[in-house]
């Protein structure tokens, strides 16, 4: 059986000045040494906001800085895929420069696998690799756009013969920091369950968490991958912390992973995190890694 890995890095947020957080540069150097088969940028590489008034030239500069930061991966022969996050996609300038930032995404990936027909990279698209079907979807807020839903439904139906189906989007099905849209959760979650998707990986919330969600047609594992720069992160919501935390420590119930909190807060102590997914045939294992003392080590205690 084929054994390989891929990684997801999300929520880097290049500074408005165009500077890349130094922590992310360190993450990329260490990640290149791990030699995953490919890396997915899980959205929010940039720092756009709805009314920022930033022009295309400045947004282009953000993307140039971000792409430069990925150089160690490409130098190691590790291709990079991407999806948009909300901060990459608010305004016309954000949207146009996001698409322009990934002109050769499909051709860069051909050495690993061809992207399947019918997708629209770098928004929603998919590929098959060694019996694993991976779908990347455009989900930048708690609203499933009809065209994304229609594409995903067809994409997963066509992948019914895959040994394993995984989906990556920016916004999680269930929020661990604030309000969950039940409509979004049920629309997307039901599609994933109907398509027998084993796991849905998301960014957006700048923390590490996992849970199993149940829908009428099955269960889906929800994986929050964290922020790969750690410039800021969010506290777990009060109800989650009451159920899973005691003092300055918490435990992810699904996995049993114990983690530290910043004293007196609901913030996870490990701020800079990435997700590595190990594939073994039709099975997969999720590894959350955090940056400590400039090294990638397992998240938690």
What are these regions, as identified by a protein language model?
Residues 288-297:
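Short, solvent-exposed aromatic-acidic interface loops
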Residues 6-8, 39-41, 82, 167, ...:
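Residue-level marker for buried hydrophobic side chains located in beta-strands
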Residues 11, 43-44, 85-86, 170, ...:
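Active-site glycine-centered loops adjacent to acidic/histidine catalytic or metal-binding residues
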Residues 51-161, 187-199, 207-280:
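Extended active-site neighborhood of metal-dependent phosphoesterases/phosphodiesterases
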Residues 4, 37, 124, 131-132, ...:
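Alpha/beta-hydrolase fold active-site loops
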Residues 14, 47, 88, 173, ...:
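Short active-site segment of divalent metal-dependent hydrolases/proteases
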Residues 1-60:
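N-terminal active-site segment of His-dependent metallophosphoesterases
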């Amino acid at each position: 059986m084929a054994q390989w890995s891929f990684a997801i890095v999300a929520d880097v947020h290049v500074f408005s000045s165009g500077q890349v957080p130094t922590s992310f540069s360190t993450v990329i150097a260490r990640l290149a040494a791990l030699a995953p088969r490919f890396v997915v940028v899980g959205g929010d590489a940039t720092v756009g906001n709805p009314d920022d008034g930033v022009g295309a030239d400045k947004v282009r500069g953000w993307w140039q800085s971000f792409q430069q930061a990925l150089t160690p991966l490409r130098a190691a022969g590790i291709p990079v895929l991407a999806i948009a996050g909300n901060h990459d996609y608010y305004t016309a300038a954000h949207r146009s420069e996001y698409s322009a930032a990934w002109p050769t995404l499909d051709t860069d990936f051909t050495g690993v696998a061809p992207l399947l027909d019918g997708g629209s990279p770098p928004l929603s698209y998919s590929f098959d690799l060694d019996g694993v079907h991976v779908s990347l979807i455009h989900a930048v807020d708690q609203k499933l756009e009809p065209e994304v839903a229609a594409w995903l439904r067809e994409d997963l139906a066509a992948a019914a013969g895959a040994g394993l189906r995984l989906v990556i989007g920016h916004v999680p099905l269930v929020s661990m920091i604030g309000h969950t849209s039940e409509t979004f959760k049920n629309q997307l979650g039901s599609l994933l369950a109907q398509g027998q998707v084993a796991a849905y990986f998301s960014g957006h919330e700048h923390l590490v968490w996992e849970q199993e969600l149940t829908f009428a047609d099955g269960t889906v594992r929800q994986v929050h991958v964290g922020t790969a720069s750690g410039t800021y992160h969010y506290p777990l919501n009060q109800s989650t912390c009451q159920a899973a935390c005691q003092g300055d420590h918490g435990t992810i119930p699904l996995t049993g992973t114990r983690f530290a909190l910043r004293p007196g807060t609901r913030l996870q102590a490990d701020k800079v995190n990435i997700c590595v997914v190990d594939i073994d045939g039709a099975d997969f294992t999720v590894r959350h890694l955090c940056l400590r003392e400039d090294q990638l080590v397992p998240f938690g205690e």
